[in-house]
Amino acid sequence: MNLMLTLLTNTLLASLLVLIAFWLPQLNIYAEKTSPYECGFDPMGSARLPFSMKFFLVAITFLLFDLEIALLLPLPWASQTTNLNTMLIMALVLISLLAISLAYEWTQKGLEWTE
């Protein structure tokens, strides 16, 4: 009963928030809102400089691998459990996934700076 009430409340609240966001009027975009602001002075140059897409992709790849490695941090504490085989299998699966992902990125030339 409590689970059903919680799910119903969450669904209704999410639906209400979506409806409010949908029915709110769109804000007007003025030229002042789209121009860059530098401490009250006119900007010295363009604030919208292009960035390297390769750098962005390498940075996203680094973040993904970093998050996956963070999953390995509790392994020393997990080794004290009674079910050691399951812990070792899960660690091996995670490390294998990391190795396969790295090999795939390498073969797709996702880690190279030159195009």
UniProtKB/Swiss-Prot annotation:
The entry sums up its family as follows:
Belongs to the complex I subunit 3 family.
Question: According to the UniProt entry, what is the EC number of this protein?
Answer: 7.1.1.2
Q: Where in the cell is it found?
A: Mitochondrion inner membrane
Its primary localisation, in coarse terms, equals: mitochondrion
Q: Which UniProt keywords apply?
A: Electron transport, Membrane, Mitochondrion, Mitochondrion inner membrane, NAD, Respiratory chain, Translocase, Transmembrane, Transmembrane helix, Transport, Ubiquinone
Which GO terms of type biological process are on file? mitochondrial electron transport, NADH to ubiquinone
- Function (record text): Core subunit of the mitochondrial membrane respiratory chain NADH dehydrogenase (Complex I) which catalyzes electron transfer from NADH through the respiratory chain, using ubiquinone as an electron acceptor. Essential for the catalytic activity of complex I.
Its Gene Ontology molecular function terms? NADH dehydrogenase (ubiquinone) activity
Quaternary arrangement and interactors, per the entry?
Core subunit of respiratory chain NADH dehydrogenase (Complex I) which is composed of 45 different subunits. Interacts with TMEM186. Interacts with TMEM242.
Q: Name one GO cellular component term.
A: mitochondrial inner membrane
- The superkingdom listed in its UniProt entry is Eukaryota
Q: Which organism is it from?
A: Equus caballus (Horse)
Where does the signal sequence lie?
none
Entry membrane topology: Multi-pass membrane protein
Gene3D superfamilies found in the cross-reference section: NADH:ubiquinone/plastoquinone oxidoreductase, chain 3
Which cysteines are disulphide-bonded? none
Q: What is this protein called?
A: NADH-ubiquinone oxidoreductase chain 3
Reactions that this protein is recorded to catalyse: a ubiquinone + NADH + 5 H(+)(in) = a ubiquinol + NAD(+) + 4 H(+)(out)
Ranges annotated as spanning the membrane: 3-23, 55-75, 84-104
